[in-house]
Amino acid sequence: MQKIVVYVYIYLFVQISVDPVALDGSSQPTENTEKDGLCNACTWRQNTKSSRIEAIKIQILSKLRLEQAPNISRDVIKQLLPKAPPLQELIDQYDVQRDDSSDGSLEDDDYHATTETIITMPTESDFLVQMEGKPKCCFFKFSSKIQYNKVVKAQLWIYLRQVQKPTTVFVQILRLIKPMKDGTRYTGIRSLKLDMNPGNGIWQSIDVKTVLQNWLKQPESNLGIEIKAFDENGRDLAVTFPGPGEDGLNPFLEVRVTDTPKRSRRDFGLDCDEHSTESRCCRYPLTVDFEAFGWDWIIAPKRYKANYCSGECEFVFLQKYPHTHLVHQANPRGSAGPCCTPTKMSPINMLYFNGKEQIIYGKIPAMVVDRCGCS
């Protein structure tokens, strides 16, 4: 008896869907059916876009392992954001993330974001180290997730103030250590001699990969560093504690780590625009604007092309899933049976502040829809 009731219900459902009937029993007009169908498709696509944007916001926070968006104001960002060459290059390169699906077929294996570069700003030490009676720059904290054998490059960037005439500058980077019996409290990391010309100040990078790896292997040995950069007259040119007009000139560490393996995937699908009358499963353009979210903590890109899938899945599945096809004909927007979903996705590169006010450059997998299909 239950089976009969189910069959009757399905039959009525199909009949009503295929041949609509008005409440008074008369058949509804069919002359505007095609127009109504197009309007319904537009409404469906608009709903899909809205859902996709909300899903992207949730995915980004989840993949970055953030419980909520970092609360960092634009004024704080202006103070913290280094005006250094490597960072400016990243910002210029990824200001607007483009759709590269036409020439790329690589996809990350993992769900979570893959860190490629970390920009670490100096912070207060857990234990205050003093030399010559006053605190010295700088102390850097590192995430325990950074493995010493994954570090490819580690550069300390320092800003040297401008000079009024051609000058030779002597730069010393010292690593602070626990006081020894003879009173020694530091050991040398790097020393170099630079020739500076009059004009604007300059950024100088120093290789500190070996020191960083030692710190990662033995965190208790990380007591900080001291930066010295004296000209011929003994004037210290290094900006260690920025003064008025020196926002963004703090020393910082640029650390690059190895990326995860990638696999190659190829697929094919339809591409449509917002004015398309295509009813089949298709990829549509969608640009996500982070500034519209109020997400100032994302440095770059400010916008990126995410795309989304929309459309019907019908005849392709007729032979393999005949009953599913029937249900889709009756209710093409229903949840049963194959759906129009992404079949290939690619990552985006992102430069952002995390909750600890560190600048991270990483890759977030599966954020751009490259192809759509029925599955």
Curated annotation (Swiss-Prot):
UniProt cross-references to CDD domains, sorted A to Z: TGF_beta_GDF8
Q: Where are the transmembrane segments?
A: none
Q: Gene name, please?
A: MSTN
Q: Which family does it belong to?
A: Belongs to the TGF-beta family.
Q: Which domain of life is it from?
A: Eukaryota
Q: What is one cellular component GO term in this UniProt entry?
A: extracellular space
| InterPro entries assigned | Cystine-knot_cytokine, TGF-b_C, TGF-b_propeptide, TGF-beta-rel, TGFb_CS
Q: Where is the signal peptide?
A: 1-23
UniProt-recorded name of the protein: Growth/differentiation factor 8
